[in-house]
């Protein structure tokens, strides 16, 4: 298995393309100049395209991915109704979902043969909308509205329209600020990192009564931390054993172990990392974590080691200016 790592650097308007080898070393293979400040990125389910959101002219760009080395070639673009904060797709590659923090909306862009062709729906009134996350069964779109301390729940219709579910939302504690989410591989639990109080919530997708319930909340910061809390990103290993979340003020990654059924997180330790880590990701093998420092303009690669999933630094690399997003593709 070959793996490619893509790093989005909006301040220099670049995507750096790296080969990740089996020992965790990166080799730079391409630098793409992007027509705008590139921020969120996601790979299509069939691994043929990389979708990126750019500003100040709000668009989603599609880059064709070369199957041999992961190199990018521009393929298409489509206008968006707000500044793109987060970008994702459904599991069948029919739609792109874009959350916009500044516009307070989530939009759905239709894909034809992998290329974006236009917005088919927009839901407004989501103050601080920070991500859009499709459930493993491809039925429910979870959309955190950070400023409203709620996660809105939508069914995605066959034509891409978002229909509010019943109940239409779940709520966090006041002042939490739900931001980014991941799902456990067993499809029974979701995990949400809360930006404003730097905590992680565990959501049981369906309890015995068919309800969605928050079953655990964990503080992700060290006990003696007294500065401003400013959590950013969250990711889980492919086997579901280890979960990671980062805080930008403290410039650290918190390491969690996950119970076998996915219902309980245990805090295992902290890894100091690049300055102001806005984004990171875990590779397909579950062996390596790549973190980007928005203020250090570097990325670091860590090996995931032991039963606790602690991080051991393998290498550090200069990238573009203000790196914010890390995406890994396998081919």
Curated annotation (Swiss-Prot):
Could you tell me which InterPro entries the record lists for this protein? 6-phosphogluconolactonase_YbhE, Cycloisomerase_2, Lactonase_7-beta_prop, N2O_reductase_N, WD40/YVTN_repeat-like_dom_sf
Q: Which Pfam families match?
A: Lactonase
Domain of life (superkingdom): Bacteria
What are the protein's UniProt keywords?
Answer: Acetylation, Carbohydrate metabolism, Glucose metabolism, Hydrolase
Please provide, alphabetically and separated by semicolons, the GO molecular function terms listed in this UniProt record: 6-phosphogluconolactonase activity
Q: What is its EC number?
A: 3.1.1.31
GO annotation terms (biological process) = glucose metabolic process; pentose-phosphate shunt, oxidative branch
Q: In which pathway does it act?
A: Carbohydrate degradation; pentose phosphate pathway; D-ribulose 5-phosphate from D-glucose 6-phosphate (oxidative stage): step 2/3
- What is the reaction catalyzed? 6-phospho-D-glucono-1,5-lactone + H2O = 6-phospho-D-gluconate + H(+)
- Please provide one cellular component term from the Gene Ontology annotations of this protein: cytosol
Q: Which residues form a coiled coil?
A: none
User: Which function does this protein serve?
Assistant: Catalyzes the hydrolysis of 6-phosphogluconolactone to 6-phosphogluconate.
Q: Extract the PANTHER family matched here.
A: 6-PHOSPHOGLUCONOLACTONASE, 6-PHOSPHOGLUCONOLACTONASE-RELATED
Q: What is this protein called?
A: 6-phosphogluconolactonase
Species annotation: Shigella flexneri
Gene (UniProt): pgl
